[in-house]
């Protein structure tokens, strides 16, 4: 059970990091 929670936690962090990077690149292009 702990492994599943850890896996989903890692997936969520990876998704958030990708989203932040994507938004950051978009912001740089708009400037």
Curated annotation (Swiss-Prot):
Example GO biological process: photosynthesis
GO molecular function terms noted in the UniProt entry: electron transporter, transferring electrons within cytochrome b6/f complex of photosystem II activity
Classification via InterPro entries: Cyt_b6/f_cplx_su6
Subcellular location: Plastid, Chloroplast thylakoid membrane
GO CC annotation: chloroplast thylakoid membrane; cytochrome b6f complex
Disulfide-bonded cysteines: none
Main localisation: plastid
Topology of this chain in the membrane: Single-pass membrane protein
Keywords, sorted A to Z: Chloroplast, Electron transport, Membrane, Photosynthesis, Plastid, Thylakoid, Transmembrane, Transmembrane helix, Transport
Transmembrane segments: 4-24
Purpose: Component of the cytochrome b6-f complex, which mediates electron transfer between photosystem II (PSII) and photosystem I (PSI), cyclic electron flow around PSI, and state transitions. PetL is important for photoautotrophic growth as well as for electron transfer efficiency and stability of the cytochrome b6-f complex.
Family: Belongs to the PetL family.
Subunit relationships: The 4 large subunits of the cytochrome b6-f complex are cytochrome b6, subunit IV (17 kDa polypeptide, PetD), cytochrome f and the Rieske protein, while the 4 small subunits are PetG, PetL, PetM and PetN. The complex functions as a dimer.
Protein name as annotated: Cytochrome b6-f complex subunit 6
Source organism: Nephroselmis olivacea (Green alga)
